[in-house]
């Protein structure tokens, strides 16, 4: 674990390699070649990447770093959906209970993926 902490002061950027026609919602993710191409542009200017979710994109990012030796630290994100309704939320905070329960289950899987990838 000491290899990962502390992150200290780093030049960091939020990274999402999605191109036109790609979307995490549609489950269409950047290829390893596209990610590596991005990393060649980012290396030297950035030390750390912040990712948004523990999905296929995240897995590919970590694989490209390991396989091709890019020198990036990764701040892993977890994409969590609403588990409670919030009627005061301006962008739609009311959800049926079955949706909230589905979100709770998916959130649990997302956290488990984050722990496994960390």
Show the residue positions of the predicted features.
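Hydrophobic faces of well-ordered beta-strands that scaffold small-molecule active sites
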Residues: 9-15, 47-51, 72-78
């Amino acid at each position: 674990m000491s290899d990962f902490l502390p992150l200290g002061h780093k030049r960091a950027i939020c990274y999402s390699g999605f191109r036109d026609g790609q979307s995490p919602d549609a489950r269409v993710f950047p290829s390893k070649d596209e990610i590596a191409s991005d990393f060649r542009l980012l290396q030297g200017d950035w030390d750390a990447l912040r990712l948004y979710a523990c999905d296929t994109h995240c897995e590919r990012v970590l694989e490209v770093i390991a396989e091709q030796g890019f020198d990036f630290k990764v701040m892993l994100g977890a994409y969590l959906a609403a588990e409670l309704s919030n009627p005061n939320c301006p962008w739609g905070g009311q959800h049926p209970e079955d949706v909230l329960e589905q979100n709770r289950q998916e959130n649990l899987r997302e956290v488990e993926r984050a722990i496994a990838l960390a």
